[in-house]
Amino acid sequence: MTEYVRNEMNRVQRFADQDGRKRNNVGFALQILQRRLASSPAAIYQSLKRRRERLEDELSEARIARRGEGTLPPTISDEMLRNLDEYAQDEIDEFEDVISAGATTAETIEQLEIEVQTLRGLEAMALDVLHSGKDTKWQQLDRILDEDLMLGADGYRRKLIIFTEPKDTLEYLRQKVVARLGRPECVEVIHGGVSREERRKVVERFMQDRDLLVLIANDAAGEGVNLQRGHLMVNYDLPWNPNKIEQRFGRIHRIGQTEVCHLWNLVAKDTREGEVYARLLEKLEAAREALGGRVYDVLGELFQERA
C-alpha cells in the first residue's frame, strides 16, 4: 500500500504545471487512503474496494469510447482543499468518498488497466488482514478496555466514548467492542448519517441507561453534544483538524464536571499523524501553563455555551 501511494505521488508531481486541479484531487485521494490505512483494516479494505470499482467503471467507459471519454472524474475545488479544516465532519466524509473513489493519475486505457490490477491485489491483501484479526491498533484499545480506570468504585464499568472518523471503522469497532464485552445492548454508534432526533435519543440513553457503556462516534455526530456523563474517552483516529482533539475532550470535561476525566490518543509513531499530534501536545502544554492547569475547564465552558 505504501509503495502504491509513493508511486502515485511521484506521478502526481507531473501535473504541477499541466493540471493543478488534477494534482490536488489525486494528492487528496492518496492522503485519504493513507489515513484510512492508519484507521482500520475495514476502512482501508472498503476504500480500496470502492476505488477499484469506480476505476473499473471508468475503464469500461473508456474502452467503449476508445478515447477515454465518459463521466468526468470527481473533483474538489482548490478553495475546499485549502479550507478543509473549516468544514463539518459529514461534509468531509462526503468529499472523501467522492474523491478517494475516482481520482487517478492514469492518462491512458493501459495505465488505467494497470492501476485497476494493482488495486485488486491491494484489496485482496487488505481483506486477508481484515480476516486475520491481526490489528495492532485494536489490540491497544483492547488493552485499554482492561485497565483499572474502566471500573468505578462500585465495580461497574464506567462509560466510555470512542471517537473515530471513517464510517467503516465505526462499524468495525462496534462489532469488536460488542464481541469483547459480550452484550450488544452495551454499545451504540452515531455518525453524520444518523438523524438528529435519533442522535438525541442515543445520547440521552448514554447519559441515563446504566447498561449502555460505550458510545462510538465521529465528529459529525459529536458536534454540539453534551457527553458529560462519560469520563473516559479514546481518540481512535485523529481528526483532519487536530485542534478538534481539544473540542472532543471538551464534550466530557465541561464546567461542573466532578469526575477526573481521562483521554487516550491512539497514534502511530513515525507518521504524519504522529508529528501533528506531537505539535498539538506542545500547544496544549503551553496553554495549560498559561491558564494555570485549567485548559480543559475553559474548553468545557466554551462548549457549554455552544451546545
State the predicted function of each range.
Residues 4-6, 10-17, 21-22, 132-165, ...:
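Conserved interdomain hinge at the start of the Helicase C-terminal
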Residues 184-218:
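Conserved helicase ATPase core of P-loop NTP-dependent helicases/translocases
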Residues 171-174, 215-231, 249-257:
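SF2 helicase motor core recognition
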Residues 1-121, 306-307:
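Inter-lobe connector of SF1/SF2 helicase motors
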Residues 259-307:
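C-terminal accessory region of SF2 helicases/translocases
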Residues 47-56, 164-191:
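Conserved helicase motor "Helicase C" RecA-like lobe of SF1/SF2 P-loop NTPases
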Residues 241-263, 280:
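Conserved SF2 helicase motif VI
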Residues 225-238, 262-265:
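A short beta-strand element within the Helicase C-terminal
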